[in-house]
């Protein structure tokens, strides 16, 4: 019986030594005082030196685990192109959803202010500067001239409306009658009569010299003056008989810049560009400002936002934009990652974060954590302690047995 005590005692002591040692490191958690004196070894070793322990843990982690090189590796793994692209795409979608949410009115107001400032202030100043250049909008204005003005031709309906306007407003019968009266003055009649007598030949000379046109023109003038209504009717019938309206329609339809000589067209194109440039230089600023002030920018902004909401192109472009931004960020990190990490470490202040976290952890929590690690990961050491205690106890029993035999 006496020989069995040392192995059993050794096994028990060896098995529970680790738990006892850990407990002694932490217990008691608070200092024990008798009167004004504090008992030695209170509180436990770790609670009494928790701040120094926290600093040592921080130095160990920052010195061997979270080195700048390791942080660079972590950053590279964290900022892989696929992850960055996914994050950027998520942010863009969130921004688009934010625009489409209940803050749409606020977004529209912000966009309205931006557009109003852009069109009402920034763009006019830029246009005024650009308009001083000789080649300002040269290609665009040439394209407008060649594809719009040069190709411009009236349709039959348009030509008919213009012809009706000319015959009813510009040249009605009454105005033609008045024009004839104003034209057939005594002097003009005399000049016409003399020219016909002098410059005609053949049958026309005989008629001009025997009968003359003076009396005929005077009678025509008197008829226009005295018989106003009848003259207007006769002129209308004459114009209808001569097919003036149809001739005007045909003439208007044939009217085109393409029928002009090439040199004339080129000169017209040049004049068109110059006039547009001069107009923009002199009145372009006021024109754009007036246009900007006349627009309801908030309504325009709402229309733009609604268009973005329903636009499949915007949604489809998010992936492309996020991919391009991710590639740009990747190239930037490849070049300056080391510098960024060096600047980020003092900003992050990781060592102080570790110290504060360790200091904020109570001794009870630290003890429970270490006990958990020992039981789950270091159980073999506990078992080994029991085995060693058992072996030492057996050795003592053997030694006692030998001594007793002697």
UniProtKB/Swiss-Prot annotation:
GO terms for cellular component: plasma membrane. It holds the Pfam family DUF445. It is found in: Cell inner membrane. Signal peptide: none annotated. It is a single-pass membrane protein. The chain crosses the membrane at residues 381-401. Keywords: Cell inner membrane, Cell membrane, Membrane, Transmembrane, Transmembrane helix. It comes from the Bacteria. Its main location: membrane. Belongs to the UPF0754 family. This is UPF0754 membrane protein Cyan7425_4067. It comes from Cyanothece sp. (strain PCC 7425 / ATCC 29141).
């Amino acid at each position: 019986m006496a020989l069995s005590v040392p192995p059993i005692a050794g096994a028990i002591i060896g098995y529970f030594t680790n738990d006892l040692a850990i407990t002694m490191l932490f217990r008691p958690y608070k200092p024990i005082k008798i009167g004004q004196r504090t008992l030695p070894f209170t509180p436990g070793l770790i609670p009494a030196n928790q701040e120094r322990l926290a600093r040592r843990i921080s130095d160990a982690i920052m010195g061997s685990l979270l080195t700048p090189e390791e942080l660079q590796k972590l950053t590279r793994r964290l900022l892989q192109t696929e992850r960055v692209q996914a994050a950027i795409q998520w942010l863009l979608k969130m921004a688009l959803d934010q625009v489409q949410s209940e803050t749409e009115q606020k977004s529209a107001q912000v966009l309205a202010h931006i557009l109003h400032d852009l069109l009402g202030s920034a763009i006019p100043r830029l246009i005024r500067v650009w308009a001083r250049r000789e080649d300002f909008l040269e290609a665009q204005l040439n394209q407008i001239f060649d594809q719009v003005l040069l190709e411009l031709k009236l349709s039959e309906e348009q030509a008919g409306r213009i012809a009706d306007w000319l015959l009813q407003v510009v040249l009605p019968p009454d105005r033609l009658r008045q024009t004839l009266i104003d034209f057939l003055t005594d002097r003009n009649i005399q000049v016409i009569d003399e020219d016909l007598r002098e410059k005609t030949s053949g049958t026309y000379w005989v008629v001009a010299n025997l009968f003359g046109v003076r009396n005929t023109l005077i009678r025509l003038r008197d008829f226009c003056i005295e018989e106003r209504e009848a003259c207007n009717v006769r002129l209308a019938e004459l114009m209808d008989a001569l097919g003036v309206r149809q001739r005007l329609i045909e003439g208007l339809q044939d009217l085109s810049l393409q029928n002009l000589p090439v040199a004339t067209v080129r000169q017209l194109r040049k004049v068109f560009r110059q006039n547009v440039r001069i107009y923009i230089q002199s009145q372009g600023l006021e024109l754009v400002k007036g246009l900007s002030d006349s627009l309801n920018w908030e309504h325009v902004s709402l229309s733009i936002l609604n268009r973005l909401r329903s636009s499949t192109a915007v949604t489809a472009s998010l992936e492309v934009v996020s991919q391009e931004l991710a590639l740009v960020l990747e190239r930037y990190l490849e070049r300056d990652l080391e510098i960024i990490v060096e600047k980020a470490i003092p900003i992050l202040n990781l060592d102080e974060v570790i110290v504060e976290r360790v200091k904020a952890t109570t001794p009870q929590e630290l003890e429970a954590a270490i006990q958990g690690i020992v039981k789950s990961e270091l159980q073999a050491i506990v078992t080994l302690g029991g085995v060693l205690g058992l072996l030492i106890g057996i050795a003592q029993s053997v030694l006692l047995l030998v001594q007793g035999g002697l």
